[in-house]
Amino acid sequence: MWNSGFESFSSSSYGAAGGYTQSPGGFGSPTPSQAEKKSRARAQHIVPCTISQLLSATLTDEVFKIGDVEISQVTIVGIIRHAEKAPTNIVYKIDDMTAAPMDVRQWVDTDDTSGENTVVPPETYVKVAGHLRSFQNKKSLVAFKIIPLEDMNEFTAHILEVVNSHLMLSKANSQASVGRPSMSNPGMGEPGNFSGNNFMPANGLTVVQNQVLNLIKACPRPEGLNFQDLRSQLQHMPVASIKQAVDFLCNEGHIYSTVDDDHFKSTDAE
């Protein structure tokens, strides 16, 4: 899948560098000097994220952080909802169903004839690597690589990478902080932090629950979204997981059934 462009978040690569490292032919950045490596190590690595995490990231002294994890270069996986090409760039709206779609800008090399400037069509699932940016309090990504998914298992694998990478980076950051008290309950963390055993976005729902809820919210039909339509849009996800998420959201009052037991609408819908 993406192994050619990434080194995994293994103990060996993590212990040496703190995360994903540059490998030939893949997503990477120019090798920094030794001094830069020491002062900016974590920020130089490509960190798997969800859009929900990126939108909740804080910006202090030109440094983005998710909890205590410093980020700069990130990857996301989602579906293209809209694509618009201009003479110098292509702007995509990418939706991973954990939050509102995020703008992703890819600059166009007008002298390049290799096909890199081809617009990826809407409704295509892609993996994006890029730099997080903020302009007038609106976050976006400047992409240096956008590749369509060949296998929907890559979507699931990305979510697992998100959990794993932030757990490891949070742990390393905690160990590096001199005199920092250890957490009395390692299964719980501050909002936006990733020290817990279960990855939970800011609203307290799991990734699966957020994806299901956002799809139901986005459905404009008066009768709401049909369960079969939900399944077709979440092909990467087991049916049992979708059903569990729907049941949970119903029980918690986030959604309700409408014309029958297979149509659902968000309680936040207008």
Swiss-Prot record:
> In which residue ranges does the UniProt entry place its DNA-binding region annotation?
74-148
Q: How is this chain modified after translation?
A: Differentially phosphorylated throughout the cell cycle, becoming phosphorylated at the G1-S transition and dephosphorylated in late mitosis. Mainly phosphorylated at Ser-23 and Ser-29, by cyclin A-CDK2 and cyclin B-CDK1, respectively during DNA replication and mitosis. Dephosphorylation may require the serine/threonine-protein phosphatase 4. Phosphorylation at Ser-23 and Ser-29 is a prerequisite for further phosphorylation. Becomes hyperphosphorylated on additional residues including Ser-4, Ser-8, Thr-21 and Ser-33 in response to DNA damage. DNA damage-induced 'Lys-63'-linked polyubiquitination by PRPF19 mediates ATRIP recruitment to the RPA complex at sites of DNA damage and activation of ATR. Ubiquitinated by RFWD3 at stalled replication forks in response to DNA damage: ubiquitination by RFWD3 does not lead to degradation by the proteasome and promotes removal of the RPA complex from stalled replication forks, promoting homologous recombination.
Question: Can you locate the Glycyl lysine isopeptide (Lys-Gly) (interchain with G-Cter in ubiquitin) cross-link?
Answer: K37, K38
Q: Give GO terms: molecular function aspect only.
A: damaged DNA binding; DNA binding; enzyme binding; G-rich strand telomeric DNA binding; protein phosphatase binding; single-stranded DNA binding; telomeric DNA binding; ubiquitin protein ligase binding
Q: N-acetylmethionine-modified residues are where?
A: M1
Q: Name one GO cellular component term.
A: DNA replication factor A complex
Write the record's keywords in alphabetical order, separated by commas. Acetylation, DNA damage, DNA recombination, DNA repair, DNA replication, DNA-binding, Isopeptide bond, Nucleus, Phosphoprotein, Ubl conjugation
List the SUPFAM superfamilies hit by this protein, alphabetically: Nucleic acid-binding proteins (SSF50249), Winged helix' DNA-binding domain (SSF46785)
According to its UniProt record, what is one Pfam family this protein matches?
Answer: RPA_C
GO biological processes: base-excision repair; DNA replication; double-strand break repair via homologous recombination; mismatch repair; mitotic G1 DNA damage checkpoint signaling; nucleotide-excision repair; protein localization to chromosome; regulation of DNA damage checkpoint
The similarity annotation says: Belongs to the replication factor A protein 2 family.
- Give the protein's recorded name: Replication protein A 32 kDa subunit
Query: What is the species of this protein?
Result: Rattus norvegicus (Rat)
